[in-house]
Amino acid sequence: MEMKQDIHLRSLVIEMKINYDALMEEEIKKLDGRKTLLLHSCCGPCSTTCIERLNKYFDVTVIYYNPNIEPFDEYLKRKQEQMKVLKKFNINFIESDYDNGDFRNLTCELKDEPEGGKRCPVCFKMRLEKTAKVAKENNFDYFTTTLTVSPHKDSQIINKIGEAVGEKYGVKYLYTDFKKKEGYKRSIELSKELDLYRQNYCGCLYGKEKGE
């Protein structure tokens, strides 16, 4: 009996998952002309397929705000790859600070969490909140993030955080699940075409050390 209840509960959780890719398509259909969108990019390779898809409907500007990336040399290397992508697609860019100290303060008590554990949503929120704030200050119609392209990132969590910070700052968050429609596969193809460096860990040294 208990096993049947457990299976039922797990099936309910699966059923409750929101199709954020479908929600994005619905929002795009409602657009009255091109809108401005601030895209938080976690790295150049992930941004490729996201920009390719969004650029058809939005005037995209990328913000590269990733204080979780360590060490600083790695941050700069990934930023350099990001600039290659922006040049390819002719995308505007907003420079942002490397607030690694703030990231460390927010996550130090979660340093022993595994990659994909409780530390990750804190990191997502830090980056999405900054993006929403900048989007509001610069009168963007929408903001969103490339984070959902990764098969290792939970799009349900990312979109819920995006929605919450969007409501906080009064700017529309565009729901996404860029890994859908073979988005991740497309990012690999575009990365090869552009000869991009693809890192082998997400960003923070906590996660890198846990994965080694």
Task: Mark where each language-model region is.
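Intrinsic-disorder-associated, low-complexity terminal segments enriched in Asp/Asn/His/Tyr and depleted
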Residues: D6-H8
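Nucleotide-activated chemistry modules centered on ATP-dependent adenylation/adenylyltransferase
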Residues: E2, V13-E212
